Regions:
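Compositionally biased linear targeting/interaction segments
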Residues: 1-368
Length: 368
């Protein structure tokens, strides 16, 4: 009877955790509808609770990112901005090849995977290369539908896609900093080396002035994937830029990939942003942060608004049992928030860091 009793407790706690995750998602929707000052603002942890959200006998957390993520050993809690990433459905080769862990050949293969033709980009891969695989399959020749689809692109490796962050929680877990003792293979340098997955999206989309004037109804009923109609015109009527990045939330790694940027300029922007957490609205502060004419080239690719978010929810039920994790991508460009993608993250294991794990495993300190 003892094991049946324990199993029943786990099942009940798991159901509690699942409902807590559902409740936390509804809480996020409520915040979007009632707490944001302006449409397109980022819902920071200053206006909503993102950790230890008590829902009945369960507790939920929203796993986020911070500017210091590469050295953190416990998670940062918050919402993940999809507009802080590079859109792999629209970014040109020159941007893609600058992403960490990526090779020029893989960047070219991404272009060939998503374009409509069978013409091989220099060093890329079209149908012939895929037909020569041990288990042959076709080249899609259509936009990405998920970022995980990168696994299918010719030349992809697990290390390239995930880096050391195999559970995708954005922090350096013990098994990601122990060399060859436990998976994944890592260099035990005390720093989390991300793969490409951390820095890319297919969902980011900032509406054009024409779309804004048409209203949310036409945008919500268009049926288009957000990442497939993402373009803005450069000031002065120049060429359209294929995507934009939220300079208020993007990492230095992402910013360094943009035209006119490099690692030094990108780090200056992030450092200024961290030192001035409430900068003036718009992009004027970027020119204040960086005294360089090069940054002017990047301005058309920058925005301070966002409408697509990832809500990475982890919860436990009563007595610290029944751990559940699920990730949602939410689009807020219509009249009401819409879930674009849901992914069960349970199989990636514990994502709340060693401190919370110790509390959960210590009855006297268990999170309730």
């Amino acid at each position: 009877m003892f094991f049946e009793y324990k199993g029943a407790n786990q099942s009940i706690a798991g159901a509690q955790a699942e409902q807590a995750n559902n409740g936390a998602l509804r809480y996020f929707f409520h915040t979007l509808n009632n707490a944001l000052e302006e449409e397109g603002d980022f819902p920071s942890e200053l206006i909503m609770q993102t950790e230890q959200i008590q829902i009945g006998q369960a507790t939920a957390w929203m796993l986020g990112r911070s500017g210091e993520t590469v050295t953190l050993t416990d998670p940062h809690f918050g919402v993940i901005d999809e507009c802080a990433k590079i859109n792999i459905n629209t970014a040109p080769f020159e941007v893609l090849e600058l992403l960490p862990t990526i090779t020029p050949e893989f960047a070219a293969a991404i272009i060939d995977w998503r374009d409509e033709d069978d013409d091989v980009t220099e060093n890329g891969a079209e149908a012939t290369m895929y037909s020569l695989q041990t288990l042959p399959y076709g080249c899609k020749n259509a936009p990405f539908e998920t970022v995980e689809e990168l696994r299918l692109v010719y030349g992809a490796t697990v290390e390239m896609i995930y880096g050391e962050d195999t559970n995708q929680n954005g922090v350096l877990d013990p098994n990601e900093n122990d060399g060859m003792q436990t998976p994944p293979l890592d260099n035990q340098d005390g720093t989390l080396n991300f793969g490409i997955l951390e820095h890319v999206t297919i969902y980011s989309k900032i509406p054009t002035e024409e779309e804004e004037s048409e209203g949310a109804d036409s945008d919500n009923n268009s049926g288009d994937q957000p990442g497939n109609r993402n373009s803005q015109q450069e000031p002065g009527g120049g060429d359209e830029v294929p995507f934009q990045v939220n300079v208020s939330t993007a990492s230095a790694i992402v910013l360094a990939c943009l035209p006119g940027m490099d690692e030094a300029i990108a780090q200056q922007i992030v450092s200024y942003r961290l030192a001035n957490p409430d900068p003036t609205e718009g992009l004027e502060w970027v020119s204040e942060a960086v005294d360089s004419e090069d940054v002017q080239q990047a301005l058309p690719y920058l925005t301070d608004k966002t409408q697509q978010f990832t809500i990475d929810l982890a919860a436990i039920g009563s007595n610290g049992n029944g751990y559940r994790r699920v990730r949602y991508v939410v689009d807020t460009s219509g009249e009401a928030p819409v879930v674009l993608h849901r992914r069960d993250m349970q199989r990636f294991g514990w994502a709340l860091g060693p401190t919370l794990l110790e509390q959960v495993n210590t009855p006297s300190q268990a999170v309730r």
